[in-house]
Design a protein with these regions (language model features):
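Gly-rich Lys/Arg/Thr-decorated short loops/hinges at beta-loop-alpha junctions or inter-strand turns
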Residues: 2-9, 68-82, 141-151, 182, ...
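N-terminal phosphate-binding or glycine-rich loops at protein starts, especially the Walker A/P-loop
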Residues: 1-53
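Short, ordered loop/turn segments at secondary-structure junctions
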Residues: 11-13, 42-47, 80-81, 113-114, ...
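C-terminal non-catalytic interaction/assembly regions of soluble proteins
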Residues: 256-419
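Short glycine/serine/threonine-rich phosphate/pyrophosphate-binding segments
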Residues: 15-25, 49-50, 91-94, 114-122, ...
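Accessory alpha-helical/coil subdomains and C-terminal extensions
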Residues: 99, 107-112, 120-130, 137, ...
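Glycine-rich oxoanion-binding loops at beta->alpha junctions
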Residues: 52-106, 115-116, 143, 168
Length: 419
């Protein structure tokens, strides 16, 4: 492709390291100024492209772009907006082409999870469907760790580290209080269908620091009697117990324990609130005193405790996306390929978006213990390297010194567009 500008945007739930991927994209694009001109970021994801709300990243200093590597969440704003098919909403695709033509955009980098991969796939097909040449590369990101093909997903390692550390620390706390007060602590974590984040709670216990952790996975149907028996055994043996429960746990009726009938913009069940449900089950069934907490945004925003492995992989995915684009690739996603566990080694691979979009990677059965409440040695071997290493941000006056970009708007050239 001839010299063209590029579009970059962030989509879906943000993470502690998605900005590291942005830094990888922007710094690498600047290193290839003979092939890529300006990089325009979409304000609030693909919505920024549709509404021509573009950000001129060239207005940012090299130092500001570099600081994205240690700044959490989405520097350009994100969105939960999924493009419908060309047949269902042709006007949106025609609008994208208008925007791309008006701003001479030939490269499209979309940083997100499974639904974002679907959006990127649709954009990558514009050359065939509407005759506009574009190279669309998906930059992987999801704390849920449920994208296929790639060994792991940027964003997950840092959430896993946060959950493992929080579970260990909270367990120390409840152990201190268990003689005369709290016996059980319940931590609710993200994970609609895949239990990867919940599994990370199992890392809190190790041979040199044994902790009674009971995990409730979305992949394992919740059995109240078995669960209560497990908690009861743990409390009788250790005096206390910690429970890590995924928001996506389902009962025997197939419904989410926490389903309130709400849906998000992607049509997924809007979950949350399973921790108090589980807490009441423990109270009613065992009569134990409990405390519960919800990790919620804290787990995905905690850049101060990010995994160094995760930060490095996130940056590498952004860098590879640009390199793949200028090499002529389209409709692909850079992936993380695990080469060995001990020592942990990985490299960058490539996957076709047609094999990624709308596919969820569940926890394999061999990663879940026979009783359904813990992780296996194989799971521990998989997870452990992903939380290794510290990559602390700089601090100022006792707080992390995160960057806020100027986010200078690009002048609009087209008429207003209603979503």
């Amino acid at each position: 492709m001839a010299f063209k500008n590029a579009f970059y945007a962030q989509s879906g739930g943000v993470t502690a390291v998605i900005n590291a991927s942005a830094a990888g994209v922007l710094e690498t694009a600047r290193q290839h100024s003979d092939k890529i001109g300006n990089v325009y970021a979409g304000r609030n994801g693909i919505i920024g492209a549709l509404t021509e709300d573009l950000i001129d990243t060239n207005a940012e200093s090299a130092a500001a772009i570099a600081a994205l590597r240690h700044t959490p969440s989405g520097a350009f704003g994100s969105c939960r907006y999924k493009l419908k098919s060309l047949e269902q909403n042709r006007r949106e695709y025609e609008r994208l082409i208008e925007i791309f033509k008006a701003h001479d955009i030939g490269y499209f980098f979309y940083n997100g999870g499974g639904d974002s991969a679907d959006t990127c796939l649709k954009v990558s097909q514009l050359a065939d469907t509407l005759g506009y040449p574009i190279q669309a590369i998906h930059v992987p990101k999801t704390v849920d760790n449920d994208l296929p093909i790639t060994d792991c997903c940027p964003g997950f390692g840092s959430v896993a580290k946060y959950i493992a550390v929080s579970t260990r620390e909270a367990s120390f706390d409840v152990a201190s209080m268990s003689k005369t007060s709290t016996k059980v602590f319940i931590l609710e974590v993200m994970g609609r269908h895949a239990g990867w984040i919940a599994a990370a709670g199992g890392l809190a216990s190790s041979p040199d620091c044994e902790i009674p952790v009971v995990i409730l996975f979305p992949e394992v149907t919740f059995d109240k009697e078995k669960f209560l028996a497990k908690v009861d055994r743990c409390v009788k043996e250790f005096g206390y117990c910690s429970v890590v429960v995924s928001e996506g746990v389902k009962g025997n009726d197939g419904n989410f324990l926490s389903d309130q009938g709400l849906r998000d913009a992607f049509g997924h069940a809007q979950l949350g609130g399973v921790a108090p449900v589980v807490a009441n089950i423990i109270k009613d069934g065992l009569g134990l005193k409990y405390h519960w907490g919800v990790a919620d945004y804290l787990q995905r925003a905690a850049r101060h405790i990010a995994s160094k492995t995760d930060v490095e992989q996130a940056y590498a995915m952004g860098k590879a996306a640009v390199e793949y684009a200028i090499a002529g690739h389209n409709s692909v996603m850079p992936t993380i390929v695990r080469q060995s566990n001990a020592p942990y080694k990985w490299t960058v691979g490539m996957a076709q978006l047609s094999n990624v979009a709308n596919v969820e990677k569940m926890m394999p059965a061999e990663f879940i213990s026979d009783d359904g409440f813990g992780i296996t040695p194989a799971c521990r071997e998989y997870l452990s390297p992903l939380i290794e290493g510290e990559d602390y941000p700089p601090y100022k006056n006792g707080l992390p010194d995160y960057v806020r970009l100027k986010n200078v708007a690009v002048a609009k050239k087209l008429s207003e567009f209603k979503l």
